[in-house]
Amino acid sequence: MAAEQRRSTIFDIVSKCIVQSVLRDISINSEYIESKAKQLCYCPASKKESVINGIYNCCESNIEIMDKEQLLKILDNLRCHSAHVCNATDFWRLYNSLKRFTHTTAFFNTCKPTILATLNTLITLILSNKLLYAAEMVEYLENQLDSSNKSMSQELAELLEMKYALINLVQYRILPMIIGEPIIVAGFSGKEPISNYSAEVERLMELPVKTDIVNTTYDFLARKGIDTSNNIAEYIAGLKIEEIEKVEKYLPEVISTIANSNIIKNKKSIFPANINDKQIMECSKMLDTSEKYSKGYKTDGAVTSPLTGNNTITTFIPISASDMQKFTILEYLYIMRVMANNVKKKNEGKNNGGVVMHINSPFKVINLPKC
């Protein structure tokens, strides 16, 4: 019985975004291609050709082009993907040939079989290149973080370094792009100019973790009419860098803020008149859950987010595949890979000629000098 291929939750999300961004403006059910795309992470070299051929065959069977205007619209979307194709000559040969076919309607109609074959090849070229690049970076990240050949102290240090590196990536790169703020250039007064990409990422990791960007983002969303009260995910993910106090201390203040009404000041009630018992319990439950995560009582790693999978813009913040394309997901994966490499270099043990001593600690060993 063949061993089951390893799967990656991160790559499942990334691959779906890539497929949907490439196939935008094309009338095709992308579910089959998405399922094939997921197989390219941790995929043996012997199977990659079969998976990519499956993607091409699906395109060949399902893609239809009705007129040259539709083709031009598709090409406008595909043009930006040229940066992620390893052989740009291949890309531009196919792309420019398709452009030529839009010269006249008669020429387009006569050559439609050739147009479809060329377009299917171009789409497969883009998808396979982007997916393989993404798979390679995700595999590197996961293997680096999951490596078993590390001491517990090194593993702990690397996980924490990576956690806060990703928080800085969100705070100093992604959130400013979402709200249109200037992106802060990493680096400090008196340091040498940044000479390479790794140094830029290193300085990004050194920037202060506590910033006002999350609150600024909430203000931006509130001005756009989006409800920002569902922020438990930001606490759990570590973006909301604040201490969570006892529920009893702040519950009245939280509820009065949400209600946006005057509090009845009497001996019997400190809650707003238009807040019912059910709403009070929901607020209490939300803060209790946040407190449990903050104190480590719950360590399942689950994070529910207001960012995806919801129907109403007034309650949640929808991020589509086209938005992910705008945020250049492969570039961010590359930044994460460089971060992981920098963290690895920083925490790698160096042979100092000492003696390994076993102790009764969860960390198990320490290094001592030879005496």
UniProtKB/Swiss-Prot annotation:
Domain of life, per lineage: Viruses
Pfam families, per the entry: Pox_G7
Up-regulation conditions: Expressed in the late phase of the viral replicative cycle.
A GO term from the CC aspect: host cell cytoplasm
Function: Late protein which is a part of a large complex required for early virion morphogenesis. This complex participates in the formation of virosomes and the incorporation of virosomal contents into nascent immature virions.
InterPro entries: Poxvirus_G7
Record-stated family: Belongs to the chordopoxvirinae G7 family.
This protein's name: Assembly protein G7
Keywords linked to the UniProt accession: Host cytoplasm, Phosphoprotein, Virion
Record-marked site positions (Cleavage): G187, F188, G238, L239
